Amino acid sequence: MKMLKKGTAVLFVMIMAVMLVACGDKEETKTYTLSQNGVDSKLTYTYKGDKVTKQTAENTMSYASLGVASKEDAEKMLKATSDKFQGIDGLKEKIEYKDDKAIETLEVDYTKISSEDMNKIPGMSSNGDTSKGISMEESAKMLESQGYKEVSK
């Protein structure tokens, strides 16, 4: 009987340890916004602990801010940049053209993209060695220094 109680206690402790470890690295998100020069930018970071696992950017650009008059002109202007994002593992990019604005959605999956490919992304900036991952804390500092504001949940 004593052995059964010890076995149950050990099993309970093991289950609790597994549950604590599973809960300790819960994915969370932070969102930042910036409106500047006719472009509204919304960045959403998904992270575990201090390590960013995914970043999604949604940029809404009026055609006037791009210096073009029409949807067709915007498509011509943005195509070359958009083409640079295609075919990179861990990166998805698309542009939706409306009557008066373009909406670009860019998603970077840091669990899939290589550090070499990450350095090829136009407009991507980072501090330090990205081969070890992207720090949420450092990303937040960098964004706030550039004028981004965190959106409260």
Swiss-Prot record:
Q: Where is this region: Disordered?
A: 117-153
Key word Signal present in the record?
yes
A Pfam family it matches: DUF1307
Does the record carry Membrane as a key word? Answer: yes
Q: Which InterPro entries match?
A: DUF1307, YehR-like_sf
The entry's keywords: Cell membrane, Lipoprotein, Membrane, Palmitate, Signal
Q: Where is the composition biased (Polar residues)?
A: 124-133
Top-level lineage group? Bacteria
| Membrane topology, from the record | Lipid-anchor
One GO location term (cellular component): plasma membrane
Covalently lipidated residues, kind N-palmitoyl cysteine: C23
Signal peptide (from-to)? 1-22
Which residues are the lipid attachment points (S-diacylglycerol cysteine)?
A: C23
Family statement: To E.coli YehR.
What is the protein name stated in its UniProt record? Uncharacterized lipoprotein Lmo0207
Q: Which organism is it from?
A: Listeria monocytogenes serovar 1/2a (strain ATCC BAA-679 / EGD-e)
